[in-house]
A protein has these predicted regions:
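Short, flexible helix-loop junctions that flank or precede catalytic/ligand sites
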Residues: 1-378
Length: 378
């Protein structure tokens, strides 16, 4: 497959994905091109791609530097913006000796907090002068999208300097009321470490530092918050409790007392998100858990009593907090998601089922037993 032919083929696939409101395109050997729409992967051609096809498609969208990195490490992350098509985040890799790629759509229009339907308290969180805000979720849960919406709100509503350090840069933020500096690792800076070390010399008000994967990155995040900046990052976990446990486990036992004190003083919010299929079949809805670092939460973190935080969140809705199960109840009550999907994504199936049975107005018109026979009591 020639480069021009490969480039046209991949662009046609990307256009098709956008027309179907897909989120991800999968290119892999011995399997047809496939795309994910509303969380479900479907083939878009009966003909499987061979190893030569996948190699040609990957090389067609890489520049020389990316191709050299891929040749050396067998991994490469980058973003592309084919003219007239859109912007996409790409992860290229080798599997069983063949090239594979996953290409994710980056929406052309910046998302907004109102447009995403996420809680309004996020507007207050992102306007904080200082502190650490962590967005939590699994891969594909919409963390980056919500984070982009929060950054855009800050960009519109304040005057300052926003720095983002990403690999790759996903959403491109124009300068509005803020100066926005976006640095891509490998393109604008040699490493995360170098970019993070130098960011404090650039007079930032907000630092968005992408995903926290290890202790060193977490230390930078806490240091930024301690020095009077608003630091925002993402973390792979399923809930606020799990995220705190994961952060604690980044550090050796002898450093955890200091870590817990640092988190109790500097954490601003923990925002956990999942995407649930909408009841009408048109896309997915963001269901969000929010933990805010109130004095009571701060005290629990300082003591290491992470398991007790969920109960405080349940009782603090007046402050803007909510658990996943409370958010699922609201989404069910608003006819946004089905009863089955609410239970399927619940932290405690039994608690949510009981809450719906006792407090839901919608439940009176729904057969709550239908389709839920396989759900375990937790």
């Amino acid at each position: 497959m020639e480069r021009d032919q490969a480039s046209k083929f991949i662009n046609d696939l990307l256009r098709l994905m956008i027309s179907r409101n897909g989120s991800d395109l999968f290119i892999t050997g011995e399997f047809p091109p496939a795309m994910k729409v509303d969380g479900k992967v479907t083939k878009v051609s009966p003909q499987p791609l061979n190893a030569g096809h996948t190699m040609a498609l990957a090389r067609a969208i890489m520049n020389d530097k990316q191709a050299a990195e891929f040749e050396r490490t067998k991994e490469c992350n980058f973003a592309i913006s084919p003219p007239g098509v859109g912007r996409f985040r790409v992860n290229a890799f080798i599997q069983q000796g063949k090239v594979g790629m996953v290409m994710r759509v980056i929406p052309a229009v910046l998302p907004t907090i109102d447009g995403l339907g996420v809680p309004q308290v996020l507007k207050e969180v992102v306007m904080s002068k200082r502190g650490l805000t962590i967005l939590v979720g699994s891969t594909g849960s919409g963390k980056s999208t919500t984070l982009a919406a929060m950054v855009d709100w800050r960009n519109e509503q304040s005057y300052g300097h926003i720095i983002t350090i990403e690999d790759p840069v996903e959403f491109v933020h124009p300068h509005k009321n803020c100066v926005v500096t976006q640095r891509e690792v490998g393109l604008d800076t040699d490493s995360w470490e170098a970019a993070l070390k130098n960011s404090l010399r650039q007079a930032p008000d907000v630092i968005l530092m992408g995903e926290v994967r290890d202790r060193e990155t977490m230390e930078h995040a806490i240091a930024f918050a301690e020095t009077g900046h608003l630091c925002m990052c993402t973390l792979h976990a399923n809930s606020a409790n799990q995220a705190l446990d994961r952060i604690i486990n980044f550090f050796p036992e002898e450093r955890r007392t200091q870590l817990l004190m640092d988190l109790s003083l500097n954490l601003k919010a923990m925002v956990s998100q999942r995407l649930i299929p909408k009841q009408d079949g048109k896309g997915r809805a963001a269901v969000v858990e929010i933990m805010l670092n109130t004095p009571l939460i701060s005290d629990l973190i300082f003591k290491g009593d992470v398991s007790e935080i969920k109960e405080i969140m349940k009782k603090s809705r007046n402050l803007g907090m909510q658990t996943f199960d409370q958010a699922l109840f609201d989404a069910f009550e608003a006819h946004t998601i089905t009863y089955e999907d609410a239970l399927r994504n619940a932290d405690s199936v039994n608690d949510l089922r009981l809450q719906i049975k006792l407090n839901s107005k919608r439940a009176k018109s729904v057969d709550l037993a239908a389709g839920t026979e396989d759900f375990a009591i937790v």
